[in-house]
C-alpha cells in the first residue's frame, strides 16, 4: 500500500523519543497510532540495496510482534519511508544498560524467554522467506511480556530459498546477535553466574 503526504505533514510529526523505533538510517515519528520512519534515501548504503523494493515486498506480509512495513510513504511522488506498527516501550538496549548499571535484575530464564520469543517470530518470517539481517538490542522492544522486532529496513524477501534454508539463515543471525549480547552485557563475576549464562547459551544453540 502507498501513502502520499506533504512536506508540511512531515514537519509537524512528533518524534519518538522513548528508546524504541530508532534506526541508523532515518528518524521515527508518531503517525496516527502507528510509527512512520523517514529514511535518508540519499545515503550510499541505502541506494545500494533498493530499499523501496525490499520494503514493498515485506509490506505484503503481516507477522504478530514484528514491525513490518504497512504502507510506503511518498512526498511529491518520491519515496521517503514507511509506516509500521508502533510499540510504546523501551528497546532491549535500554533494558540491558539498566541491568549493567545494577538498576534491575535479569536471570537466565529471562534470557531464554527473550530468545524463544524472537525465535518464534523468525520461524514465521522464514515461512514467508524473509531474512531478518539486522537483529540487535536497538531493534528489539519489550512490551506486555513479549519481545517485538522493529526497524526492518534491511529485511529482505528471498523467494529462491526454502523455508528450511530461510530458517537456518535466520537462526544463524539470531544466535550471532545473542552471543554478542551475552559477551557485551553479562560480565559474569562468579562461577555461579558464569554457569547460569553458559547454560543459557547451550540451550540456545541446541535449537
Model-derived features: where do they sit?
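C-lobe/activation-segment region of protein kinase-like
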Residues: 144-207
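Conserved N-terminal boundary motif of the eukaryotic protein kinase catalytic domain
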Residues: 2-19
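Conserved alphaE helix
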Residues: 108-126
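Conserved hydrophobic "DFG−1" position in protein kinase catalytic cores
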Residues: 30, 86, 141-142
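Catalytic phosphate/metal-binding cores of nucleic-acid and nucleotide-processing enzymes, i.e., regions
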Residues: 24, 39, 120, 137-140, ...
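ATP-binding glycine-rich loop module of kinase domains
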Residues: 14-72, 103-104
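Conserved structural core of kinase catalytic domains
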Residues: 67-114
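Catalytic-loop of the protein kinase fold
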Residues: 122-144
Amino acid at each position: 500500500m502507498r501513502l502520499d503526504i506533504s512536506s508540511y505533514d512531515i514537519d509537524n510529526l512528533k518524534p519518538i523519543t522513548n528508546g524504541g523505533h530508532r534506526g541508523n538510517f532515518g528518524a521515527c515519528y508518531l503517525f496516527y497510532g502507528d510509527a512512520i520512519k523517514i529514511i535518508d534515501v540519499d545515503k550510499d548504503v541505502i541506494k545500494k540495496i533498493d530499499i523501496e523494493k525490499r520494503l514493498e515486498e515485506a509490506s505484503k506480509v503481516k507477522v504478530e510482534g514484528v514491525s513490518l512495513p504497512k504502507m510506503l510513504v511518498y512526498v511529491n511522488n518520491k519515496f521517503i519511508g514507511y509506516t509500521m506498527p508502533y510499540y510504546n516501550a523501551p528497546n532491549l538496549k535500554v533494558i540491558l544498560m539498566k541491568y549493567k548499571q545494577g538498576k534491575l535484575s535479569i536471570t537466565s530464564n529471562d534470557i531464554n524467554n527473550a530468545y524463544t520469543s524472537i525465535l518464534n517470530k523468525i520461524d514465521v518470517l522464514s515461512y514467508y522467506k524473509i531474512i531478518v539481517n539486522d537483529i540487535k538490542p536497538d531493534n528489539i522492544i519489550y512490551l506486555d511480556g513479549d519481545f517485538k522486532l522493529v526497524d526492518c529496513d534491511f529485511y529482505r524477501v528471498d523467494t529462491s530459498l526454502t523455508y528450511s534454508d530461510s530458517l537456518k539463515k535466520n537462526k544463524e543471525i539470531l544466535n550471532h546477535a545473542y552471543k554478542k549480547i551475552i559477551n557485551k552485557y553479562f560480565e559474569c563475576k562468579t562461577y555461579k553466574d558464569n554457569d547460569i549464562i553458559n547454560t543459557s547459551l547451550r540451550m540456545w544453540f541446541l535449537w
